[in-house]
Amino acid sequence: APAMNQAMWGNPSTQQNCTTLANRGVHLFGPGAGLQACGETGLGRMLDVDEIVTQAADLFTSGILAGTHVLITAGPTREAIDPVRFITNHSSGKQGYALATAAIEAGARVTIVSGPTHLALPDRANCVFVTSTNEMYNAVQQAIQDVDIFIGVAAVADYRPVTISEQKIKKSAAPSNNGITLELVENPDIIASVANSEPKPFTVGFAAETENIIEYARQKLVAKNLDMIIANDVGDDDIGFNSDQNRTTILWPDRTQEIPIMSKSAMASRIIELIAETVENND
């Protein structure tokens, strides 16, 4: 884990020595860039200890997703109405975070783009925190270039207010106290943009429905050009957003498979196994 002045790091002798070490099988962690003790800025800072640990662990990682980069969206998004109120949903982020943990355990490098949750971060995941759908869309676009597998678990708000009031909207502002009209505009479709990007990562969606579960999931699979979709009934309190259990039906373009009720962590492991199998078969 080299650490030195940026001029020393850039010296040809240093670079030649590093090349010699690499050719002998020595792995270098870093250096990173930033402000140095001498006051200069550039490459030469030792990586943070957590980053060294993560990179070192990756060297010894094996598993069904070893060598892959998985990007997962998780949790809800919030669309502000005024400084006090917002539009959101009941998503807890539990299934998305469980999938991140399962992917890490399968050997993948994992990035999570997460809406607001109260969950502990999965160890060794790179986390990007957002609030609104536009923020999540932008974060995904920035991260997608080297992603092998994208799993869109987040319960994204489809619409947002056209304008956000700078002050709290008072009840007295409603004409004759008969309520107010909230004008909405459609948000960008995150998973469709990923599924139609070039190069396209293996793209997995979620369909959280309350009726016609399989029919609506199949429509989404086709319309958004997905490789897989996981359908679940969020109207069932036993397996809904805040439950620790889940029951799903997984759909591919040519088949379906029902997964019985189990913990969300066990469900995540099973989904990761099926994703890995499908990716391998596609290759």
State what each model feature region is.
Residues 1-35, 41-56, 196-228:
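Short, glycine-/small-residue-rich phosphate/pyrophosphate-handling segment
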Residues 1-2, 71-75, 113, 152-154, ...:
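Short beta-strand segments
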Residues 14-15, 19-20, 64-132:
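Glycine-rich phosphate/diphosphate-binding loop of Rossmann-like nucleotide-binding domains
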Residues 33-69, 87-88, 235-283:
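Glycine-rich phosphate/pyrophosphate-binding loop and the adjoining helix
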Residues 88-106, 169-191, 225-231, 258-261, ...:
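Gly/Ser/Thr-rich active-site loops/lids in small-molecule metabolic enzymes
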Residues 131-234, 238:
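Glycine-rich phosphate-binding loop
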